[in-house]
Design a protein with these regions (language model features):
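Internal nucleotide-binding/catalytic subdomain
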Residues: 1-70, 74-77
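Short beta-strand-initiation
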Residues: 4-7, 67-69, 124-126, 144, ...
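Pocket-edge structural micro-motifs
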Residues: 23-26, 84, 131, 159-161
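Short, flexible active-site loops
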Residues: 32-42, 84-97
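Active-site "cap" helix and flanking loop/linker of ATP-utilizing ligase/carboxylase catalytic domains
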Residues: 49-70, 76, 86-135
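PAS/PAS-like sensory domains across diverse signaling proteins
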Residues: 79-81
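Glycine-rich active-site loop/lid that clamps phosphate-bearing ligands
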Residues: 123-124, 131-164
Length: 165
């Protein structure tokens, strides 16, 4: 495996060209499917700066307006490989709803309607866990352990009500 780290950058570009960048996150995958995003990522300053430079270059190349998610691999020899660029709010950034001063959704709207971008600062360390239903399940959503999770101080659960897994 070439990757030692899968950093995630969320950035938003406004109509006037201002760019707001969220704290770097660490995406963790199981069987190539996002399992969790941990913010802030536990990485060294040099790797963070290199990945941040790569994310900014991607933003310049795309020259778009609104939210962008840039996922990348950083190899053992610190080579940066872009894995995905999503020009939209992204499931990796759902942590921003409670974890940051301004969510990715609010900043996306601000950007496309010409309002100043909001503060992207992290309020507190945050983990977003991607809950997926059993393959082939259809019908009402049931989350095992929901009561226990909701009893945790600071925990929030978002259930999107998709009809089919």
């Amino acid at each position: 495996m070439i990757s030692v780290w899968k950093p995630l950058f969320l950035a938003c570009r406004s109509l006037n060209g201002d760019v707001a960048v969220y704290p770097v996150g660490d995406n963790r995958h199981i069987d190539s499917i996002l399992h969790e995003t941990v913010v802030p990522a536990d990485i060294d300053k040099t790797a963070t700066e290199g990945a941040m430079d790569a994310a900014k270059k991607v933003m310049e190349i795309f020259d778009g307006i609104g939210m962008f998610c840039v996922e990348m691999f950083v190899t053992e020899d610190d080579q940066i490989l872009i894995n995905e660029v999503a020009p939209r709010p992204h499931n990796s950034g759902h942590y921003t709803i409670e974890g940051c001063v301004t969510s990715q959704f609010e900043n996306h709207i601000r950007a496309i309607v010409g309002l100043p971008l909001g503060d992207t600062s992290l309020i507190r360390p945050t983990v977003m866990v991607n809950l997926l239903g059993e393959e082939g399940h259809s019908g009402k959503t049931y989350v095992e352990g929901l009561y226990d999770v909701c009893a945790l101080k600071g925990a929030t659960v978002h259930i999107y009500g998709k009809g089919v897994s």
